[in-house]
Amino acid sequence: MRKIGIIGGTFDPPHYGHLLIANEVYHALNLEEVWFLPNQIPPHKQGRDITSVESRLQMLELATEAEEHFSICLEELSRKGPSYTYDTMLQLTKKYPDVQFHFIIGGDMVEYLPKWYNIEALLDLVTFVGVARPGYKLRTPYPITTVEIPEFAVSSSLLRERYKEKKTCKYLLPEKVQVYIERNGLYES
């Protein structure tokens, strides 16, 4: 059975925090690969202005291209409407029956698990991996594997705000992603 990690998100924009989480879990669990799964429309972000799929995908390709064990999974981008993890993982487990999927989520999402669509059935499809900051306990009634990662306090929303305020984002996201954002005028007021 192959072991593959999946990290989902809008990646608007992708940053070093995403890459750090993926790399730490990859090594901690001896995974074969980590697949980045960009969302079409995340249910918890409906109604929010999201950068185009094309731009988010291009930035994600630039961010992950240097790591041979990172790939991009387009499963959710091929569907219209909200992206529910259960629907996606049902499709992926049918498509890849020889894979044990490890679905990577942040500490904030661990506490949100009881509200996930079809969570009980989803638990039969994936092993959840919760990433925690040092000294932070993940509390959930569901079985999860915990991986402690170094603290790196950056988020896509912080980066969008910094770009709007014309503040530097150097060392927070890959340089090629920065160049793409600046050339395309993303996140300007």
UniProtKB/Swiss-Prot annotation:
One Pfam family hit: CTP_transf_like
EC number: 2.7.7.18
Pathway(s) it belongs to: Cofactor biosynthesis; NAD(+) biosynthesis; deamido-NAD(+) from nicotinate D-ribonucleotide: step 1/1
Single GO biological process annotation from the record: NAD biosynthetic process
Swiss-Prot/TrEMBL catalytic activity: nicotinate beta-D-ribonucleotide + ATP + H(+) = deamido-NAD(+) + diphosphate
Keywords for the protein's UniProt record, in alphabetical order: ATP-binding, NAD, Nucleotide-binding, Nucleotidyltransferase, Pyridine nucleotide biosynthesis, Transferase
GO molecular function, one term: nicotinate-nucleotide adenylyltransferase activity
Gene3D superfamilies xref list: HUPs
Keyword flag Transferase: yes
Residues forming coiled coils: none
Top EC class, one word: transferase
Family to which this protein belongs: Belongs to the NadD family.
PANTHER family documented for this protein: NICOTINATE-NUCLEOTIDE ADENYLYLTRANSFERASE-RELATED, PHOSPHOPANTETHEINE ADENYLYLTRANSFERASE
Task of the protein: Catalyzes the reversible adenylation of nicotinate mononucleotide (NaMN) to nicotinic acid adenine dinucleotide (NaAD).
NCBIfam families per UniProt: cyt_tran_rel, nicotinate (nicotinamide) nucleotide adenylyltransferase, PRK00071.1-3, PRK00071.1-4
Protein's UniProt name: Probable nicotinate-nucleotide adenylyltransferase
The species this protein was found in: Bacillus anthracis (strain A0248)
Gene name of the record: nadD
